[in-house]
Regions:
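Generic recognition of stable, solvent-exposed alpha-helical segments in well-folded globular domains
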Residues: 7, 11-18, 40, 205, ...
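Hydrophobic alpha-helical scaffolding
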Residues: 2, 170, 200, 254, ...
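Mobile active-site "lid"/loop adjacent to the S-adenosyl-L-methionine
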Residues: 338-367, 379-381
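Non-catalytic, mostly N-terminal accessory regions of nucleic-acid modification and defense proteins
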Residues: 1-246, 310-323
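Conserved S-adenosyl-L-methionine
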Residues: 225-334, 339-343, 350
Length: 382
């Protein structure tokens, strides 16, 4: 990262954190964390969708491209007929999924959110209510965001039960949420500039950086409790640099928000890893997390980075319910909760993971160690 890009990130972090911090007066840190990170995720998928949309528009109008739409077949260039056909073609889902871009329906697109957040309750919205031929009616901004999250999940099965849909239930003031949306809208993640200079950063890289920064800030705000889902980047980087996970299966049995996976992918990119479909694509990640909200944070983190993942399909206690019983990983890395006292149950007595003997019932440290060894491939590292 060059000095200009570093300054861009520093200014961006300060700007967005200042905007998000306005919610602290009315929400606990553990709650507003999910509000802000959920909006960042929605901004990411919408920006990625818009990037692909702009790319497609140029391809439709390029005579040299396979997707070219000849104006002569649609009433001529610049005619309403031609523009309508371009617009219709831009709504074809396959153009996006072929590039591993999430399909974002109209009601979940960022510009729609920004504009509709200003509409008074009871007024019509620019889409029909689900299953009806009548326009949906505006309620609150929290409901508007929940509706967007539900729409993204509905259209992208990979994200099912991943996104936070509790904006309305937290009863956050609509004006504060609308202001936060406006602040995020004010930043162009797709075409970043700094001091008049256009930067070569992609929206995925920018939002991934912002997501990581916010996770760290929220962990600090929550104190000791924040350490349950966030391992400091310096520690994560050290472990990844030691193990050097260039390719293969990477497993974290206490994954928190997924920091080890993100750093593994960054390690490959920094050391000349081949790029496939916009990502290095040389590792497959497996993880487990017992806290449902933290599990969602990790899944969103992977989606923002474009990483395929297997988190067992649901949250789960790793020691009590191993969701990857047959996994033998090439790299195992973790920062498990140390000195857990209340972890044992009778069903664990003859568990096959205890390859060196049954661990002490009053402390889970040796249970974690044996669990990790059990899931390590014969030639693996941990």
């Amino acid at each position: 990262m060059n000095p200009i890009e570093q300054q861009f990130f520093t200014d961006l972090e300060k700007k967005l954190w200042t905007a998000a911090d306005k919610l602290r007066s009315s929400l606990d840190a553990s709650v507003y964390k999910h509000v802000v990170l959920g909006l960042i995720f929605l901004k990411y998928v919408s920006d990625a969708f818009e990037e692909r949309q702009n790319e497609l528009r140029a391809q439709f109008q390029n005579p040299e491209h396979d997707y070219y739409m000849d104006p002569a077949e649609y009433g001529g260039a610049g005619t309403p007929e031609y523009e309508e056909n371009i617009a219709a073609e831009l709504e074809v889902r396959d153009y996006y999924t072929e590039k591993n871009v999430f399909w974002v329906p109209l009601e979940a697109r960022w510009l729609t959110l920004r504009d509709c957040a200003q509409i008074p309750p009871g007024d019509a919205l620019p889409w029909n209510a689900q299953g009806k031929d009548t326009p949906e009616k505006m309620r609150t901004v929290g409901w508007l965001i929940d509706n967007a999250m539900e729409a993204v999940e509905r259209e992208n099965p990979k994200l099912k039960n991943v996104l936070n849909k509790d904006f309305a239930r937290t009863q956050i003031d609509s004006h504060k949420l609308a202001d936060l949306i406006a602040h995020f809208s004010d930043t162009n993640f797709s075409q970043p500039t700094f001091g008049g200079q256009v930067l070569s950063l992609k929206s995925k890289d920018i939002l991934g950086h912002v997501y990581e920064y916010f996770l760290g800030q929220f962990a600090l705000a929550e104190g000791k409790k924040g350490g349950q889902y966030y391992t400091p980047k310096s520690i994560v980087t050290l472990i990844v640099e030691m193990l050097q996970p260039f390719k293969g299966r990477v497993y974290d049995p206490a994954m928190g928000s997924g920091g080890f996976f993100v750093q593994s992918e960054e390690f490959i990119a920094e050391h000349g890893g081949a790029v496939v479909k916009g990502k290095t694509g040389q590792i497959s990640v497996y993880g487990q997390e017992s806290n449902p909200t933290t599990w969602k944070l990790a899944a969103m983190n992977m989606a923002i980075r474009g990483l395929d993942f297997n988190f067992g399909g649901q949250p789960g206690d790793t020691l009590q319910n191993d969701l990857h019983p047959d996994l033998r990983a090439d790299y195992v890395m973790a920062n498990p909760p140390f000195n857990m006292k209340e972890w044992w149950s009778a069903k664990l007595e003859s568990d096959p993971r205890w390859i060196a003997g049954t661990p002490p019932q009053g402390n889970a440290n040796f249970a974690w160690l044996q669990h990790m060894l059990y899931h390590l491939a014969p030639t693996g590292s941990m």
